[in-house]
Amino acid sequence: VIGGDECNINEHRSLALVY
């Protein structure tokens, strides 16, 4: 995750669930 922002991580988790 670029930046390491909590919001960014949260979005990344959603994408991970989709994949």
Curated annotation (Swiss-Prot):
**Single GO MF descriptor:** serine-type peptidase activity
A single Gene Ontology CC term: extracellular region
Q: In which tissues is it expressed?
A: Expressed by the venom gland.
**Top-rank taxon, per record:** Eukaryota
What UniProt keywords apply to this chain's record, in alphabetical order? Blood coagulation cascade activating toxin, Glycoprotein, Hemostasis impairing toxin, Hydrolase, Protease, Secreted, Serine protease, Toxin
Domain Peptidase S1 per the UniProt entry, residue ranges: 1-19
Keyword Manganese tagged: no
Q: Which GO terms describe its biological process?
A: proteolysis
Activity regulation, per record = Inhibited by PMSF, but not by hirudin.
So what EC number does this one have? 3.4.21.-
Q: How is it modified after translation?
A: N-glycosylated.
Keyword set includes Glycoprotein? yes
Q: Where in the cell is it found?
A: Secreted
Q: What does this protein do?
A: Thrombin-like snake venom serine protease. Causes the specific clotting of fibrinogen (FGA) with release of fibrinopeptide A. The aberrant fibrinogen is then incapable of being cross-linked, forming easily dispersible clots.
What is its quaternary makeup?
Monomer.
| Family according to the record | Belongs to the peptidase S1 family. Snake venom subfamily.
- Name it: Thrombin-like enzyme TL-BJ 1
Q: Which organism is the protein's source?
A: Bothrops jararaca (Jararaca)
